[in-house]
Design a protein with these regions (language model features):
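Short, surface-exposed alpha-helical segments at coil->helix boundaries
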Residues: 1-4, 105
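A conserved amphipathic alpha-helix that caps or lines the catalytic cleft of carbohydrate-
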Residues: 3, 7, 61-64
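Flexible loop/turn connectors
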Residues: 15, 28, 35-152
Length: 153
């Protein structure tokens, strides 16, 4: 929802595709269909594609390279989760990463707080879940930074 809210606020045209991708074959087929729709809707325009995980982003990059022999300049691709697939792809994939160290620190703090509350309140259970927001970070790699890489050469 955050992505859609941002696009609406910034008046950025966007589409959301929701498909269950159970295995590699299904993922490839769904991503091929999505790619065809995007290309039909946006000929000659830059296409920013945010994919729900790095594995599917890698499949999408592979489909584009197979089709065009390269990663076209008008495609900017971002995955999610900073998995090894994003770092090891033929074109390293830009990705949104969770800050695992901060998540772990906050989880331990919450656990310690709950243990202390439990000791002090005679075993009263926590009544409401605790929500903490850890801001993810964008790791820029070749699927969004090709213009910058070309300038460096």
């Amino acid at each position: 929802e955050g992505f859609e809210d941002f696009c609406r606020e910034q008046q950025i045209p966007h589409r959301v595709f929701l498909h269950e991708m159970k295995d590699q074959t299904a993922s490839q087929e769904h991503l091929k269909e999505i790619l065809s729709e995007i290309e039909a809707d946006s000929p000659g325009r830059k296409k920013g594609i945010f994919v729900s995980n790095d594995t599917h982003a890698s499949i999408l990059v592979n489909l584009l390279v197979r089709k065009y022999g390269k990663l076209p300049e008008d495609y900017l691709i971002v995955g999610f989760d900073d998995s090894p697939a994003s770092r090891n792809a033929i074109f390293p994939i830009s990705t949104v990463a969770q800050q695992i160290d901060m998540l772990a620190t906050e989880a331990v703090k919450l656990l310690v707080e709950q243990i202390e509350e439990h000791k002090n309140s005679k075993h009263t259970p926590v009544s409401e879940p605790v929500h903490k927001m850890i801001t993810p970070v964008l790791i820029r790699r070749e699927t969004t930074e090709r213009d910058l890489l070309a300038e460096d050469n």
